[in-house]
Amino acid sequence: MFPQIWGVIFLFTPTVFSELFKDPELLAGFYQGDIKAHPIRTRNGIVNQIYHWPNRTVPYMIEDDAFADSHYREILRAISIIEENSCVIFKPATEMDFPMALVITSKGLGCNTVHLGYRNKTQVVNLEIYPLGEGCFRIGSIIHELLHVLGFEHQHVSQNRDQYVSIQWKNINPQYNINFVNNDNSTAWHDFDEGYDYESVMHYVPRAFSRNGQPTIVPLREGAENMGQRFYMSEKDIRKLNKMYRCPDHV
């Protein structure tokens, strides 16, 4: 029997959520699955501009021999999607840019990011090799990690999440409870007046960190058909990014 919530049947097929209970964004054992350094408690997007990339520009380097040509091109496609929908620019890093640059590698387990936002030090994104369209090489998973780099946290821990989702603590593996603690009254981060977004590419899948195969995140309102999708930036993702980086022609 498929879980049915608000008249929506969630069909967790391999083409939608490959390896549902082995999602590579959750595998590495870091904070919230894919953030190595425990961040400031957040709402969803960072407000303080010291954590925004200077001049809206991210110098990046894709490690030599880390990826096949097809995977390299998919990373560039994800970068292009962000650039086309905002004023943020990713530019190949030079020696002058280091150590304040982004390094994209495939040496570790899963898909993960060292820090949220700009931290005046080298930022690293790991994308474990999977076939294109699966695991870390779902286009939305690459975008997800790049949005962490730009300053986004996961949607399900936003300050107002309890109005939109019910966290099923009984179904969560207890060692991962910290990954579901929300941001309470943090003022360091903001939703940029866009509100909660079930469709965000930053939202967990409904059964993230489940101990028993049952949902850990249950939507309380309609419109959650695509919760946890990894295919595209949602309209709210795009608007939040543009507001965060004060993009004059995109807000």
Swiss-Prot record:
Entry's Gene Ontology cellular component terms: extracellular space
Family matches, as Pfam families: Astacin
Glycosylation site residues: 55, 120, 185
Phenotype reported upon loss of the gene: Loss of cleavage of accessory gland proteins Acp26Aa and Acp36DE in females mated with mutant males. RNAi-mediated knockdown in males results in incomplete and delayed processing of Acp26Aa and Acp36DE in females mated with these males.
GO molecular function, one term: endopeptidase activity
Tissue-level expression: Produced in the male accessory glands and secreted into seminal fluid. In mated females, confined to the reproductive tract and also detected in eggs laid by mated females (at protein level).
Leader sequence residues: 1-18
Cofactor(s) the record lists: Zn(2+)
Cofactor stoichiometry and binding remark: Binds 1 zinc ion per subunit.
GO biological process, one term: cell migration
UniProt xrefs under PROSITE patterns: ASTACIN, ZINC_PROTEASE
Binding residues annotated for Zn(2+), in chain numbering: 144, 148, 154
UniProt xrefs under InterPro entries: Astacin-like_dom (IPR034035), MetalloPept_cat_dom_sf (IPR024079), Peptidase_M12A (IPR001506), Peptidase_Metallo (IPR006026)
The record's account of how the chain is modified after translation: Undergoes cleavage in the male during mating with a cleaved product detected in the ejaculatory duct and/or bulb of males by 8-10 minutes after the start of mating. Further cleavage occurs in the mated female. May undergo cleavage in a two-step process where it is first cleaved by Sems, making it susceptible to activational cleavage which may be carried out by another protease or by autocleavage.
CDD domains: ZnMc_astacin_like
Cystine connections: 87-247, 111-136
Keywords: Disulfide bond, Glycoprotein, Hydrolase, Metal-binding, Metalloprotease, Protease, Secreted, Signal, Zinc, Zymogen
Record: active site: 145
Function summary: Seminal fluid metalloprotease which is transferred to females during mating and is required for processing of two other seminal fluid proteins Acp26Aa and Acp36DE in mated females.
Protein name: Seminal metalloprotease 1
Species per Swiss-Prot/TrEMBL record: Drosophila melanogaster
Classification of source organism: Eukaryota, Metazoa, Ecdysozoa, Arthropoda, Hexapoda
The encoding gene: Semp1
